[in-house]
Amino acid sequence: MNVNIRRMTLEDIVQVVAIDRVSFSLPWPERSYRFEVTDNPASRAWVAEADGNIIGMIVAWLLADEAHIATIATLPGFRRRGIARALLTHALQTMISEGAKNAVLEVRAGNLAAQEMYRRFGFEESGRRPHYYKDNGEDAILMSLSDLQVNRETSN
């Protein structure tokens, strides 16, 4: 399977929202993705595409020298195939080249697969937001990566 990672466009929004809806119990509304693509100067958004279909996406914000991973997801049938890893690698490498020195994100306490991937990149748990997710009161785990540089995962 040949996967191409490219900037998210307005034409991708319908497929991106579909990925979001099957991936998260609290998906972003379509207008949020439109804002990220057209109006948010801090936003960096990409999609992973295979055979003309969007199979994954990531939205990150570059805030001063900090890369904030806002959301990342792949279609269920494409999980555990390195798509999210490729998206995160691409996002971090791009933001490093734009001056990012560290990275942060939030992840559900129960999303162990995502936490495992983030740890492979060097992210460490830096805090917890109790009852953060409104649908079920689940905690958010805050993870951070200090001294961001091309490392063992981002160099793949």
Positions of the model-derived regions?
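Acetyl-CoA-dependent GNAT
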Residues: N4-R79, L88-E98, S146-N156
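Well-formed, non-transmembrane alpha-helical positions, independent of function
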Residues: Q15, E116-M117
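Preference for well-ordered, secondary-structure-rich cores of eukaryotic proteins
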Residues: T74, R85-A86, N102, R108, ...
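Conserved G/P- and acidic residue-centered "switch" motifs that form tight phosphate/ATP-binding loops
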Residues: G82
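Short glycine/proline-centered loop/turn elements that form peptide/ligand docking sites
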Residues: L88, G110-A114, H131-N136
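Conserved GNAT acetyl-CoA-binding A-motif
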Residues: M95-E106, R129
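Conserved catalytic-core motifs of GNAT/GCN5-like acyltransferases
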Residues: E106, R119, E124-I141
